C-alpha cells in the first residue's frame, strides 16, 4: 500500500505564497554545486539528499515543529521523493512539492535564475 505523498505546487502558486509572506519552510534538496549554479531567490533550508546521513538524525531540530514545508530540487523528482519520506517520518506535516523544481521557477517566474 503506497504511503502519503506531497501535494503538488506550481511555481506561480509558490510565488503568490511568498509574496504574501506565507508562513512556510522552503527545503532545497539539491547539491551544493547546483545551488551555486541556480540559487533559489528566497531563504531555504539546504538538505542535500547525498548528505542525508549527516542531517537525518537532527531533522526535527532543522525544521520547525509545525507549518507547511515546500520542497524543491532541479526538476521536482528528488524533492518528491524527499517529501514522501518526510511524510512517513512526520505524517501530520503539510508537505508540498514544487512541480518542475527550480527549472519551472526559472521558466515561469524568474528568468534571472539560470537553467541547467
Stretches found by the model and what they are:
Residues 72:
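Short, surface-exposed ligand- or partner-binding patches at beta-edge/loop junctions that are enriched
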Residues 1-25, 32-68, 77-116:
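Rhodanese-like catalytic fold shared by cysteine-dependent sulfurtransferases
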Amino acid at each position: 500500500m503506497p504511503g502519503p505523498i506531497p501535494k503538488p505546487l506550481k511555481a506561480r502558486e509558490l510565488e503568490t505564497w511568498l509574496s504574501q509572506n506565507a508562513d512556510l519552510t522552503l527545503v532545497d534538496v539539491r547539491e551544493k554545486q547546483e545551488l551555486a549554479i541556480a540559487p533559489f531567490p528566497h531563504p531555504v533550508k539546504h538538505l542535500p539528499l547525498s548528505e542525508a546521513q549527516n542531517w537525518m538524525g537532527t531533522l526535527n531540530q532543522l525544521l520547525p515543529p509545525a507549518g507547511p514545508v515546500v520542497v524543491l530540487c532541479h526538476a521536482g523528482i528528488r524533492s518528491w521523493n524527499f517529501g514522501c519520506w518526510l511524510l512517513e517520518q512526520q505524517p501530520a506535516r503539510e508537505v508540498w512539492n514544487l512541480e518542475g523544481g527550480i527549472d519551472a521557477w526559472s521558466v515561469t517566474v524568474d528568468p534571472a535564475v539560470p537553467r541547467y
